[in-house]
Amino acid sequence: MLLIPAIDLKDGQCVRLKQGDMDQATIFSEDPAAMARKWVDLGARRLHLVDLNGAFAGKPKNLEAIEAILGEVGDEIPVQLGGGIRSLETIEKYLDAGLSYVIIGTAAVKDPGFLQDACSAFAGNIIVGLDAKDGKVATDGWSKLTGHEVIDLARKFEDYGVESIVYTDIGRDGMLQGINIEATVKLAQAVGIPVIASGGLSNIVDIEKLCEVEDEGIEGVICGRAIYSGDLDFAAAQKRADELNGELDDA
């Protein structure tokens, strides 16, 4: 089970939002590259970046910070990024800069042909981000709820060749209410590609619960506010996940 620290970028700083609200941003660091280094030193095996300004603007907005992070840790672990990815040119630019994966969210829902083209051009590098509330997909930085069922879209995107799915329960994100395990497992069971859980991770119990269902196809979990607020000790949590995986593998 991969525990993946999130570094959410707004105006070049590392922040956390509550339920995607740009007006409810808590600044945790003015040096995102140093924050990336901290998580890698604590044992992170992948990082999850979000260009928040880009998500709302529809184009890259935190390139300097992203390049600084890649310069700091990009040679050591895979780095994935979402937010504002709406063109093949942007994807190419990011992959050339050293990103391992790009996450396509809103654009995948609104323009499935773009996602298909991206999967064809950059096979193995494309993750789809599905944000949902009560089983329905949301777009545009969570500001618009669609009528699309998450599982229907996930199956379609799997056919396109996406590498994995980041599934966020937006009713829980930034609220420390616990991961929506049931919905995440339901999605993972419906597709044959890995699912990364996101939204609401609050403590070590969430990690233990996720490890129990990892075999359903859950590859990892994105760690946000909980590791910044201190509710979750990242290094201890990754160690615990590794221990549990070892026990489950031996069973």
Curated annotation (Swiss-Prot):
What's one GO BP annotation on this UniProt entry? L-histidine biosynthetic process
Report which superkingdom the organism of origin falls in. Answer: Bacteria
**Active-site residues, Swiss-Prot/TrEMBL:** 8 (proton acceptor), 131 (proton donor)
- Known PANTHER family for this protein? 1-(5-PHOSPHORIBOSYL)-5-[(5-PHOSPHORIBOSYLAMINO)METHYLIDENEAMINO] IMIDAZOLE-4-CARBOXAMIDE ISOMERASE (PTHR43090:SF2)
Question: Which transformation does this protein catalyse, written as a reaction?
Answer: 1-(5-phospho-beta-D-ribosyl)-5-[(5-phospho-beta-D-ribosylamino)methylideneamino]imidazole-4-carboxamide = 5-[(5-phospho-1-deoxy-D-ribulos-1-ylimino)methylamino]-1-(5-phospho-beta-D-ribosyl)imidazole-4-carboxamide
Enzyme Commission number(s) from the entry: 5.3.1.16
By its UniProt entry, which CDD domains does this protein fall under? HisA
Q: For this protein, what is any one GO molecular function term? A: 1-(5-phosphoribosyl)-5-[(5-phosphoribosylamino)methylideneamino]imidazole-4-carboxamide isomerase activity
Q: Which GO terms describe its cellular component?
A: cytoplasm
Q: Tell me, what's a Pfam family for it? A: His_biosynth
Keyword tags: Amino-acid biosynthesis, Cytoplasm, Histidine biosynthesis, Isomerase
User: What InterPro entries does the record point to?
Assistant: Aldolase_TIM (IPR013785), His_biosynth (IPR006062), HisA_bact_arch (IPR006063), Isoase_HisA-like (IPR044524), Isoase_HisA-like_bact (IPR023016), RibuloseP-bd_barrel (IPR011060)
Task: Report the top EC class in one word.
Answer: isomerase
Q: Where in the cell is it found?
A: Cytoplasm
Family indicated by similarity: Belongs to the HisA/HisF family.
Q: What is this protein called?
A: 1-(5-phosphoribosyl)-5-[(5-phosphoribosylamino)methylideneamino] imidazole-4-carboxamide isomerase
Describe which pathway this protein belongs to, using the record's wording.
Answer: Amino-acid biosynthesis; L-histidine biosynthesis; L-histidine from 5-phospho-alpha-D-ribose 1-diphosphate: step 4/9
* Organism per entry: Burkholderia mallei (strain ATCC 23344)
